Curated annotation (Swiss-Prot):
Record PROSITE patterns: RIBOSOMAL_L5
Record keywords: Ribonucleoprotein, Ribosomal protein, RNA-binding, rRNA-binding, tRNA-binding
Gene that encodes the chain: rplE
Organism domain of life: Bacteria
NCBIfam families: PRK00010.1 (NF000585)
Keyword Transmembrane applies: no
Gene Ontology terms, MF aspect: rRNA binding; structural constituent of ribosome; tRNA binding
Oligomer status and interactors: Part of the 50S ribosomal subunit; part of the 5S rRNA/L5/L18/L25 subcomplex. Contacts the 5S rRNA and the P site tRNA. Forms a bridge to the 30S subunit in the 70S ribosome.
Record carries keyword Nucleus: no
The protein's name: Large ribosomal subunit protein uL5
Family: Belongs to the universal ribosomal protein uL5 family.
GO cellular component: ribonucleoprotein complex; ribosome
GO biological process annotation, one example: translation
Amino acid sequence: MARLREFYKETVVPELVKQFGYKSVMEVPRIEKITLNMGVGEAIADKKVMEHAVSDLEKIAGQKPVVTVARKSIAGFKIRDNYPVGCKVTLRRDQMFEFLDRLITIALPRVRDFRGVSGKSFDGRGNYNMGVREQIIFPEIEYDKIDALRGLNITITTTAKTDEEAKALLSLFKFPFKG
């Protein structure tokens, strides 16, 4: 079992029950899934760029990403319908907890001038979004073998009803919020 899953059951759940006064442990918010999305606009000009992005995301997530395509043509961006424009991965269960563990303990501290992540990036429904500017903060990516620095978006979907509950949940997972 993943280290953070045990930590959630033994430490986070009792703390949240005490903090918010839930009547049942099933009411306690939990992390449902983590979605990693990498938009690759440069893939229009060069198809190799998409292959590199897919392989980078596969190394980071430990699972093969799905290539996302444009829903409609946009002449200004030189995009046609069904052109590949990015890739995404949805992590659940143990892989999700393993990724969260690596993100909190290894990847985020490797960000240059890191002072914590914003506490304002909640969507109003208990989900958290954050962007990573460079994929090289993850130890799985070898600096010598990358073709370009690419950022990615990380969405943490929780069952929390409010942003306050979601922030408390992530804070108990030792998520490094500013201030």
